[in-house]
Design a protein with these regions (language model features):
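N-terminal auxiliary segments of SAM/dcSAM-dependent transferases
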Residues: 1-31
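Conserved class I S-adenosyl-L-methionine
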Residues: 72-79
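Conserved SAM-binding loop of SAM-dependent methyltransferases across substrates and taxa
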Residues: 82-94
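Helix-to-beta-strand junctions that scaffold the AdoMet/dcAdoMet cofactor pocket
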Residues: 94, 189-190
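Mobile active-site "lid"/loop adjacent to the S-adenosyl-L-methionine
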Residues: 107, 146-183, 201-202
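S-adenosyl-L-methionine
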Residues: 113-136
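Conserved small/polar residues in nucleotide/adenosyl-binding loops
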Residues: 203-210
Length: 210
């Protein structure tokens, strides 16, 4: 769970009664490991945006930005849905910053927008542009984050259906798509800015080589 800034694990259950924290996520100051999975559907705090639930590994992007001046920064989250990393960026930049969260799939963008509204920071704009369109803001963003669409080997552990969707052809298509996205992302990044690239892959071959 992410979003309980300044709290200690022992107090999480006092602040949010539906949760029991087993400890902190080592690489995310606002992240907590949950002792069990509660029924989020019935938790009013979850629906109010008091916290967001995501894999601990997804919160590692915050560690990558340590030492990068993010307060007041402009961040482009180019492949943003469902919004877990977007909420983290929104917290990092503060009210004086801006996060542009882009998702080309309108159905997924709707989920993204809902999560952004719940988070309530007021510094996120959700767009549904192709990468080349949103990246026409050349050299404008301080940070560009690409959580690239991939062949999804990292999902095998928690989603058995993902194994059946895997194919060599899908890997090749994803690699080509990633290459296009990265080239556009680079255009949008200001000189001296920070580019974050992540996938849920177990192998290096589907990722761009140049």
């Amino acid at each position: 769970a992410e979003g309980l800034r300044g709290e200690q694990p022992a107090r999480v259950s006092e602040v949010l009664p539906m949760l029991t924290a087993a400890g902190r996520v080592p690489w995310c100051a606002d992240g907590f490991l949950l002792a069990g999975r509660p029924s989020f559907t019935f938790d009013s705090d979850f629906h109010a945006g008091a916290y967001y639930v995501q894999e601990a590994a997804s919160q590692f992007v915050g560690c990558l930005l340590q030492g990068v001046p993010t307060f007041g920064a402009r961040i482009l989250d180019l492949c943003a849905a469902p919004g877990g990393k977007t909420t983290l960026y929104a917290s990092l930049v503060g009210r004086g910053g801006l996060v542009v969260a882009n998702e080309i799939d309108r159905r997924r963008a709707s989920v993204l927008a809902d999560n952004v509204r719940k988070w309530g920071t007021g510094n996120v704009v959700v767009t549904t542009c192709e990468p080349h369109a949103v990246c026409d803001c050349e050299a404008w963003f301080d940070v560009v984050a690409v959580d690239a669409p991939c062949s999804g080997e990292g999902m095998f552990r928690k989603d058995p259906a993902a194994r059946g969707e895997w194919s060599e052809n899908n890997v090749r298509q994803c690699a080509a798509r990633q290459d296009d996205i990265l080239r556009e992302a680079w255009r949008a990044l200001r000189p001296g800015g920070t580019l974050i690239y992540s996938t849920c892959l177990l192998y290096t071959s589907p990722s761009p080589r140049d």
